[in-house]
């Protein structure tokens, strides 16, 4: 994919990241493909982790990848709702979103989106804001009435998204969408990233979280998993709670044209680079 010389790679890569030899080997395996990166708000609220994440995205761009960022914002939303005395309620991991809540959710996510774009621009990496108010690409229908303004994606504007990428910019996408009446809806960020990955038939969907990956019954990391093994672990309650919908979403994405989904630990330095460009990888790779 990349024709960068060794000295150029040395200048681009972080000293505590994958080696030049590994990167050269893995770059040959990729060919101008899309990498969707969903980063949870729980990781991005930490200033040090935020800085490393931004730097790693810039590295990928310099290496010739087409990274597309979808960000969460749950922790910031919770804090803001607490400030105004609105209680956060969830049904099956989805935030119940009434009229007052959706306005706050939208404001918080748009502000967060702006911060990510500005951080990339500061490192001379051109980025484009995609929110419900600016360059929206996601159409939705209501998930169900009990959840209020929570949407399920029904369409992605693939043409506009590819135009941004052809202009050599990194799309930065907030998990928000509009219905046929231009009403804003909150969308689960994993679902948003999955829908975009499927639409673009991405090479990878990387889900950066504050967990190591999928763990077995002895709390050891499982490096790779398929639908059969995942369903067994769900039946055995080894995979439980909020991890169940996350894994089911990953399996759905992997069975719809995306080569693999990876859950990686954003608390570890350069986990994104190690997963894509090293022998040891990072996290749990999920295939159909």
From Swiss-Prot:
It comes from the Bacteria. Keywords: Amino-acid biosynthesis, Arginine biosynthesis, ATP-binding, Cytoplasm, Kinase, Nucleotide-binding, Transferase. Catalyzes the ATP-dependent phosphorylation of N-acetyl-L-glutamate. The lineage of its organism: Bacteria, Pseudomonadati, Pseudomonadota, Alphaproteobacteria, Candidatus Pelagibacterales. GO terms for molecular function: acetylglutamate kinase activity; ATP binding. One of its GO terms (cellular component) is cytoplasm. PANTHER family: N-ACETYLGLUTAMATE SYNTHASE (PTHR23342), N-ACETYLGLUTAMATE SYNTHASE, MITOCHONDRIAL (PTHR23342:SF0). It is an enzyme of class 2 (transferase). Belongs to the acetylglutamate kinase family. ArgB subfamily. This is Acetylglutamate kinase. Its EC number is 2.7.2.8.
């Amino acid at each position: 994919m990349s024709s960068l010389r060794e000295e150029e790679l040395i200048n681009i890569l972080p000293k505590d990241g994958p080696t030049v030899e590994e990167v050269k080997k893995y770059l040959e395996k990729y060919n101008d493909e899309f990498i969707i990166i969903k980063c949870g708000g729980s990781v991005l609220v930490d200033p040090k982790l935020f800085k490393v994440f931004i730097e790693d995205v810039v590295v990928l761009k310099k290496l010739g990848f087409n990274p597309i960022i979808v960000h969460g914002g749950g922790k910031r939303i919770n804090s803001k709702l607490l400030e105004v005395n609105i209680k956060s309620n969830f049904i099956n991991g989805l935030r119940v979103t009434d009229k007052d809540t959706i306005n706050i959710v939208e404001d918080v996510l748009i502000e967060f989106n702006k911060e990510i774009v500005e951080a990339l621009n500061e490192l001379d990496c051109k980025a484009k804001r995609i929110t419900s108010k600016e360059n929206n690409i996601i159409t939705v229908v209501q998930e169900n009435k009990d959840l209020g303004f929570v949407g399920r994606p029904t369409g992605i504007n693939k043409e506009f998204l590819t135009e941004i990428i052809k202009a050599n910019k990194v799309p930065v996408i907030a998990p928000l969408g509009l219905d046929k009446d231009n009403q804003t809806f909150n969308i689960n960020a994993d679902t948003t990233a999955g829908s975009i990955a499927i639409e673009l038939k991405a090479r990878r969907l990387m889900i950066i979280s504050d967990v190591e990956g999928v763990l077995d019954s002895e709390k050891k990391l499982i490096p790779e998993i398929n639908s059969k093994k995942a369903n067994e672990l769900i039946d055995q309650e080894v995979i439980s709670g909020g991890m169940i919908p996350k894994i089911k979403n990953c399996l759905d994405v992997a069975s719809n044209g995306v080569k693999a989904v990876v859950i990686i630990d954003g608390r570890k330095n350069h986990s994104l680079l190690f997963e894509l460009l090293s022998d040891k990888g990072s996290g749990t790779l999920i295939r159909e």
